Structures are given as structure tokens and as C-alpha cells.
Amino acid sequence: MAENSLLEDSFIQYKCSEYTVGEYYNKINAHSDIGRYTTIIKAINPNIYTPINISLESTIQRLSNEKLPKISDKEGRTNLALQLTKHYGFLYLPKHIESFNHDIELNQHVSLLPLTEEMLRPYEGESVGQWIKLVETIQYAFNRINIPDFTKSMRSAEVFFHDEQIQLYLNEVNPVYDFDKETISLKCDSIASAIMLYIVSNKRRLKSCEVCSKLFYAKRSNAQYC
């Protein structure tokens, strides 16, 4: 059971049926031809998706023990990000769907507000780096919580940017009040923010297995093995 009473143990994700990955040229802005090529994962049909209920604890267990390919192994990192997208879906598709539904509802109440092409545009996909960054941050957070001296051998700049990334994920968590039910809940923009909130809220349950050294969430305070 989560320590934070507002915390959820699962997260609703949305999965498309097929995904593809490729190099795309991203312009800095619409008024300039300057940009760079980025490896992006896209859905074959982004307008068709299925909601799935993801267990946060089992997802965190998997990602915390995922072996990340080296930075120089671009193909390995691309394949891992594609594999994770196929299994869990896009990180920020829920936020896109929420924004789209909000625009539709707003349009129903404000007839003067037209539905623009930007509002109706399907989700354009995500860079490979987004999943890789999440896995890196999860593993850093686990070690930072479980190993007291973990950051002593790290450069201060490295610690700063990892801590900053954790905070960026947590900044995507917002309290929401339901006036009809008179209840308050924590709403996460993405599975990334839901995962990070779960990690920091359950840090006292985090243990290191005495046999394989893998980190796991203990059901009992005296648990020693995963």
C-alpha cells in the first residue's frame, strides 16, 4: 500500500497498435530552416489507441533493472526505446489526449472559440531520448535513495542535472479537486511523473536483495530478498 494516501498504484496508459522509428529533421521554429535530425518513434495510426492499466510497482521494478546500452550504441538505445514504447505506449500521449478533450469541451461552452488545426493534430510521437532519460533517472533515483554515499563519486554537475530531472517529472504532478465528490487527488501528466512520484513516496520500502543486489519494493520491513 502506498504511504501517500493520494498516491495511485496504477496509471492509465494508451497504446497504439503499431509503431515505427526513423530519423526526422526538426526545425528550431516555423520561420527558420535551421534544425537537426532526431530519432523519433511514431505511431502508424496515431488516432487509434487503447487504454491499458499499468501497475506502477511492476513497471518500476522492470525499468530499475533494465540494462541500458552505452551512449555510443545508438542502435541499442533506439531498439530499447521502441521496445518500451510498444509495451507501455508513448510517455506523453495521455497528456495530449487530456488536452484534446479539454479543447473539445471548451469549444462546447465557448462557441466563439474555433477548433484549430493545431488542436486537431494527432500525436506526433516522441524522441528515443525520452524513454532513455526516464530509465536513467529511475535508476539514479533508486541508487540515490538506497545507497547513502552514491553521489560522492559523481561530479556535482552530474548530480545537479539528475536531481533537476527528477524535479521536472514531479512538476508534472498537480492536485485536482472534485467539487461534486468533495475529494482531492494527484493528477500526473504522464507515466513518467507517476513513476517518479511513486518512487519518492515509497522510498522507505525500497530494499536491496542480499542475493542478487537488485532493488525491490519490500512488502515487509524485515524483507531481505526480492
Please report, for each region that a protein language model flagged, where it lies by residue.
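Short helix-coil boundary/hinge micro-motifs
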Residues: 1-215
